[in-house]
Amino acid sequence: MASENMTPQDYIGHHLNNLQLDLRTFSLVDPQNPPATFWTINIDSMFFSVVLGLLFLVLFRSVAKKATSGVPGKFQTAIELVIGFVNGSVKDMYHGKSKLIAPLALTIFVWVFLMNLMDLLPIDLLPYIAEHVLGLPALRVVPSADVNVTLSMALGVFILILFYNIKMKGIGGFTKELTLQPFNHWAFIPVNLILEGVSLLSKPVSLGLRLFGNMYAGELIFILIAGLLPWWSQWILNVPWAIFHILIITLQAFIFMVLTIVYLSMASEEH
């Protein structure tokens, strides 16, 4: 619920501010007067990303250690269904041989899903605690609604794309792919390099921006509902949107995983 001292515009702006650290002074940034500098990091996004990543590791490791050959419990069954689903997706889409792809796909799917799931928390819950209990000037709890997080993950995928291209084709083969496709003639090398370069770079950019755009829009809708409507009427829109958003957060995690598998499969193909 919006604060009585805030206008709807102030409320919306407040919830779109990250908790930032100025690396030059190692002090928290005032959201009302942010410095015009590159040397800031969104420590709330980093914190929740790391915590959710650790949560994924702890949950899956605990299930793996307690797994039995008998009748599994409900939680173990759910984990096994997720693992089976991801493993099946990898087998269907990745045709190379690599022990990294399936664990990577599982990590991406669950990690992105957990980050997206933070969007279903009450919009004022953690920011209120951060402001009134911890004295923090701002807090955003959805890491995947931060373009820095999604593009950083996409950058990691891009590095793997380059690695698998060079590993499977060699530096010479990868260079030929960039310079002699689609026009197999030396005179078209500059044109080929531009076309293939744009195609290669567009993969991580679109991968990161797609996730960011969908999650930012979802977060913004929750904020608009909370900031513009009276508290007693918010549930009329919040509940249907939250139910629909469950599909969105799952779908976006799946899409990020699938595109990663597809891109790495393409990079692993020998020509």
Swiss-Prot record:
Membrane-spanning parts: 40-60, 100-120, 146-166, 220-240, 242-262
Gene3D superfamilies on file: ATP synthase, F0 complex, subunit A (1.20.120.220)
Keywords: ATP synthesis, Cell inner membrane, Cell membrane, CF(0), Hydrogen ion transport, Ion transport, Membrane, Transmembrane, Transmembrane helix, Transport
Subcellular localization(s) per the UniProt record: Cell inner membrane
One GO CC term on file: plasma membrane
InterPro entries linked: ATP_syn_F0_a_bact/chloroplast, ATP_synth_F0_asu, ATP_synth_F0_asu_AS, F0_ATP_A_sf
Main subcellular location: membrane
Membrane topology designation: Multi-pass membrane protein
GO biological process: proton motive force-driven plasma membrane ATP synthesis
GO molecular function: proton-transporting ATP synthase activity, rotational mechanism
Complex and partners: F-type ATPases have 2 components, CF(1) - the catalytic core - and CF(0) - the membrane proton channel. CF(1) has five subunits: alpha(3), beta(3), gamma(1), delta(1), epsilon(1). CF(0) has three main subunits: a(1), b(2) and c(9-12). The alpha and beta chains form an alternating ring which encloses part of the gamma chain. CF(1) is attached to CF(0) by a central stalk formed by the gamma and epsilon chains, while a peripheral stalk is formed by the delta and b chains.
Role played: Key component of the proton channel; it plays a direct role in the translocation of protons across the membrane.
Family indicated by similarity: Belongs to the ATPase A chain family.
Record protein name field: ATP synthase subunit a
Lineage per the UniProt record: Bacteria, Pseudomonadati, Pseudomonadota, Gammaproteobacteria, Enterobacterales
